[in-house]
Amino acid sequence: MELELQRRCAESTFRSRHAAVIYRGKRVLVYGVNRNKTHPYCSYYGKNPEAIYLHAELDAIVKVLNSEGAKTLKGATIAVCRTTRDGRYADSRPCEGCQRAIEAFGLKVEYTTKEGWTE
């Protein structure tokens, strides 16, 4: 799962390369990446209601909502990864808006720092 997150970060065309995975136990539910795509949750949870991008966390949450529903999210874990252009870990603590969404849907969160993973 960790290598897959790094691979998905590397595919990003953004300066900040983020990917997220939502999982329960050893079962991966969905991956998300930051992208040029909007969703109503961008304005609801984001700082900028006119944003034209979707954070990796919200991308993953929306995918689960569309495929399996909100009940699937409660108690699952979201892991958020950011890598630099040369593949090193970077700080990927969810922003204030994404953190509100994570809490609203009852997810546990893990993310990368420059030193690696934290919980």
Range-by-range predicted roles:
Residues 1-119:
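Zinc-dependent deaminase catalytic domain
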